């Protein structure tokens, strides 16, 4: 019986199969000193406007790079983080304190949703569904659009993306 695969937990129940990265999240919170952090109900502030020149330069760019890389890996089982992580990954070249604070906010959100993952229900009709959305030039700094999609088979996502 499969329990772990490439750091992803595989939980088999009567309802179906769930993939999760609970253990990875707990290690991530420990690594970045956020095991006792204040919980958040959303990954980012609502209507957050952020660009490459927001705030002051951070002296912790290595930590920022590590956080973004870790969060990108986490999107394997947490597609709900894709937009936020994609937005913040655009500032890898010159991260600012605001960008670092936003990545830490995502970790605070993740700390409250540790048990989230993707559930593939065993009694669901197998049907391929796709959804897409775009903000059409929503990023004011360069007037570029952000678009995204998700495809699900049965009850669980099988492919997703968010791109600028």
Language-model-derived ranges and their functions:
Residues 3-17:
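Short, conserved secondary-structure transition motifs
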């Amino acid at each position: 019986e499969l329990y772990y695969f490439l750091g992803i937990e595989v939980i088999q129940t009567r309802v179906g199969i769930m993939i999760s990265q609970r253990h990875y999240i707990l290690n991530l919170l420990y690594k970045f000193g956020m095991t006792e952090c204040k919980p958040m109900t959303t990954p980012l502030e609502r209507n957050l406007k952020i660009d490459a020149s927001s705030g002051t330069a951070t002296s912790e760019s290595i930590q920022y790079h590590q956080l973004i890389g870790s969060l990108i890996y986490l999107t394997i089982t947490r597609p709900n983080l894709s937009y936020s992580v994609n937005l913040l990954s655009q500032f890898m070249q010159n991260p600012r304190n605001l960008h670092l604070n936003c990545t830490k906010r995502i970790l605070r959100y993740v700390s409250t949703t540790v048990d989230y993952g993707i559930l593939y229900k065993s009694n669901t009709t197998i049907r391929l569904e796709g959804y897409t959305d775009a903000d059409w030039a929503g990023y004011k700094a360069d007037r570029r659009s952000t678009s995204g999609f998700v495809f699900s088979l049965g009850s669980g996502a099988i492919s997703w993306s968010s791109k600028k």
